[in-house]
Amino acid sequence: MPTSRPFVLTPGEPAGIGPDLCLLLARQAQPRPLVAIASRALLAQRAEQLGLSIELRDAGPQDWPGEPAPANCLYVWDTPLATAVTAGQLDPRNAHYVLETLTRAGRGCLDGSFAGIITAPVHKGVINEAGIPFSGHTEFLAELTLTEQVVMMLATRGLRVALVTTHLPLRDVAEAITAERLQRVTRILHADLVSKFGIARPRILVCGLNPHAGEGGHLGREEIEVIEPTLAGLREEGIELIGPLPADTLFTPKHLEHCDAVLAMYHDQGLPVLKYKGFGAAVNVTLGLPIVRTSVDHGTALDLAGTGRVDIGSLQVALETAYQMSGAA
């Protein structure tokens, strides 16, 4: 085992910008050892398309790098494609390749080979088109690590937003917000802010579900019947929670100035504000896993693959956050 465990980078959808991100990142020397789990042939082809001269160095279970690669160099754990890739053109035959890169990364973290995973975007649709049920990175890694409950959190400079519910139709959100779910999510958020972000006593702002946080029950009773009593019980466990507050006033400097995270009830309640504040410089973090996993905050951008018009800002933030969470910063 090397003295400094490497982090691993999975490029996601091979026809998207994930391979481009890996190569563009490799132009700079990295502060920590970093291995891309990808097809070496794909990276070589994409580098040629981008006009980049990047040395691809082999890495694998018998020879993990213990030192960072220099500029214009990338360590690669070669993972074969099922079929050749054309930038921007999806092919379901490569769905198993995408999942194999994630499986290698997750298992390597579990056995102690890797310090953390940074993921580039996958295309859920083409994986499902291949006949493989797939909801996303978060659910896949939760199953791989035998984790019952995980929490999605996005972060940018000065703001962290975690979600009680994630990819649900809006009509199903209220029913999904149960006392049990709210307890589990809040406990995971609090625990990981302490253990992975080094915040001794996190201060968490909690959004209400309804406009004006229910207006005393006139605009919905979820705050009165579920959210408020659940938060009261969690406060007795020593968790510092403020709310439920109306989301339209919670996301103002007055409230955000002294908080460590916001807990939003649903996807589009919290994430538009965060993405407006930090799009291109935000990171997606999976809380509750026994491993460190961060991701970029954008999609596969098939139309930009192979063009060189790709911003690596979100990937850099994802790397920095993974280093921080693992104690390697």
UniProtKB/Swiss-Prot annotation:
Sites where the protein binds a divalent metal cation: H167, H212, H267
Pathway: Cofactor biosynthesis; pyridoxine 5'-phosphate biosynthesis; pyridoxine 5'-phosphate from D-erythrose 4-phosphate: step 4/5
Residue ranges crossing the lipid bilayer per the database entry: none
InterPro entries cross-referenced by the UniProt entry: PdxA, PdxA_fam
Entry EC number(s): 1.1.1.262
Keywords, sorted A to Z: Cobalt, Cytoplasm, Magnesium, Metal-binding, NAD, NADP, Oxidoreductase, Pyridoxine biosynthesis, Zinc
Pfam families per the UniProt record, alphabetical: PdxA
Positions with a binding annotation for substrate: H137, T138, K275, N284, R293
Catalytic activity as recorded in UniProt: 4-(phosphooxy)-L-threonine + NAD(+) = 3-amino-2-oxopropyl phosphate + CO2 + NADH
Subcellular location(s) per record: Cytoplasm
GO biological process terms on file: pyridoxal phosphate biosynthetic process; pyridoxine biosynthetic process
Job of this protein: Catalyzes the NAD(P)-dependent oxidation of 4-(phosphooxy)-L-threonine (HTP) into 2-amino-3-oxo-4-(phosphooxy)butyric acid which spontaneously decarboxylates to form 3-amino-2-oxopropyl phosphate (AHAP).
Miscellaneous field: The active site is located at the dimer interface.
Family to which this protein belongs: Belongs to the PdxA family.
PANTHER family reported for this sequence: 4-HYDROXYTHREONINE-4-PHOSPHATE DEHYDROGENASE
Protein name (Swiss-Prot/TrEMBL): 4-hydroxythreonine-4-phosphate dehydrogenase
Taxonomic lineage from the root: Bacteria, Pseudomonadati, Pseudomonadota, Gammaproteobacteria, Pseudomonadales
Gene: pdxA
